[in-house]
From Swiss-Prot:
Cofactor(s) in the UniProt record: Mg(2+); Mn(2+)
Similarity comment: family membership: Belongs to the DXR family.
Residues that bind NADPH: T10, G11, S12, I13, Q38, N100, E102, G178
EC number: 1.1.1.267
HAMAP family named among the record's database cross-references: DXP_reductoisom
Entry superkingdom: Bacteria
InterPro entries documented for this protein: DXP_reductoisomerase (IPR003821), DXP_reductoisomerase_C (IPR013644), DXP_reductoisomerase_N (IPR013512), DXPR_C (IPR026877), DXPR_C_sf (IPR036169), NAD(P)-bd_dom_sf (IPR036291)
Molecular function terms, GO-annotated: 1-deoxy-D-xylulose-5-phosphate reductoisomerase activity; manganese ion binding; NADPH binding
Protein name as catalogued: 1-deoxy-D-xylulose 5-phosphate reductoisomerase
Organism: Tropheryma whipplei (strain Twist) (Whipple's bacillus)
NCBIfam families given in the database record: Dxr
Broad class of enzyme this protein falls into: oxidoreductase
Disulfides per UniProt: none
């Protein structure tokens, strides 16, 4: 029986995790729940699961993690708000089922150095879960490259990104996700973040991490080995599988999703990223290779741009423009530097500094 804490329990990943746990109650006991919004749903979840320990807000979620005995924490919080929960999980030696990629991207090497056992960070992202499974087929020294697949989002074939509404951007062709990640998928910025995440989780150089468009979202990612073999993980597009894999690690979850129908006629396409999507991907590579606080700065720049789009302050076409502008301004004004402060304090300070810079950029852009 694994004791589980779920932070971000009322969001897309959190609710799917609870559905999975309710079908596997002999294997999991939820000992803590936390969310930032939807208080009534949080109370309902606690009642259904028989969970006494609940918290609301990012700081309270981290406190809950530190104060509660548990085996695994599912961090399903969206965005930079998940940083403190990842920190608290690693600090207390619990296993981390990580859906909140932003926290790892922000914490980088500092968080990796905090791990105390192999598998302490188990990815929930379908792409990284796929890679983790495919890498069991060979030695690290035998890996030639990682190939992250992407659906391409709703606008892959669209030449112009002008006139795209919020409703359009939230309508993902394959996955049912929260608003922030849906928009990040539409701009392909999410894939850029996943490149940084893959580098951190698996230690593969950025030059050996590729992206390919796979509209069907059946092959979730691949590992190419030096002998020419390619090992892929394929399944129906259902987040229950990577959620179940992360919670059940090192074992596989039983009956997580239905198997693929191999007797049915089907088509798997693999296409190159478009010029529009490469802008996001290349920006993420640049931040990742620079390291230090730069990935956190990039993430904050993008979160502000997406929030501005959702608020109607900028167009969809300007999201990556704003992200790139803010990131470039920050890198011109500030450099990575050693600090005697706690790394978490430094990350939070630079995150806040970036958001102030983004606010000015967005206000000036809105006034044009």
């Amino acid at each position: 029986m694994q004791r589980v804490i779920i932070v971000g329990s009322t969001g897309s990943i959190g609710t799917q995790a609870i559905d999975f746990i309710l079908k596997n109650r002999d294997s999991f006991l939820v000992v803590g729940l936390a969310a930032s919004t939807q208080t009534s749903l949080l109370r309902e979840q606690a009642q259904v699961l028989g969970t006494k320990n609940t918290a609301q807000g990012a700081s309270e979620a981290a406190e809950l993690i530190e104060a509660t005995e548990a085996d695994v924490v599912l961090n399903a919080i969206t965005g930079a708000a998940g940083l403190l929960s990842t920190y608290a999980t690693l600090k207390t030696g619990k296993r981390l089922a990580l859906a909140n990629k932003e926290s790892l991207i922000m914490g980088g090497k500092y968080f990796l150095d905090m791990t105390t056992f192999k598998g302490q960070i188990t990815p929930v992202d379908s792409e990284h879960s796929a890679i983790a499974q495919a890498m069991k087929s060979g030695k690290f020294s035998e890996v030639n490259k990682l190939i992250l697949t992407a659906s391409g989002g709703p606008f892959y074939d669209r030449e112009s990104l002008e006139g795209i509404t919020l409703k359009d951007a939230l309508d993902h062709p394959t996955w049912n996700m929260g608003p922030m990640i849906s928009i990040n998928s539409a701009t392909m910025f999410n894939k850029g973040l996943e490149i940084i995440e893959a580098h951190l989780l698996f230690g593969i150089p950025y030059s050996q991490i590729d992206v390919v468009i796979h509209p069907q979202s059946i092959v979730h990612s691949m590992v190419e080995y030096k002998d020419g073999s390619v090992i892929a993980q394929a399944s129906v597009a259902d987040m229950t599988l990577p959620i179940g894999y992360a919670l059940s690690w090192p074992n596989r979850a039983l009956n997580a999703v239905r198997p693929l129908e191999w007797g049915a006629r089907q088509r798997w396409d693999f296409l190159p990223p478009t010029e529009n999507s490469m802008r996001s991907i290349n920006l993420a590579r640049r931040a990742g290779e620079a390291g230090g606080v730069y990935p956190a700065v990039l993430n904050a720049s993008n979160e502000c741009a997406v929030e501005a789009f959702m608020a109607g302050k900028i167009s969809f076409a300007r999201i990556i423009h704003v992200t790139e502008t803010v990131f470039n301004l920050y890198t011109k004004q500030h450099t990575n530097r050693e600090s005697a402060k706690n790394p978490i304090e430094v990350i939070l300070e630079e995150d806040a500094r970036t958001r102030e810079l983004a606010k000015t950029v967005i206000e000036n852009m809105s006034a044009d």
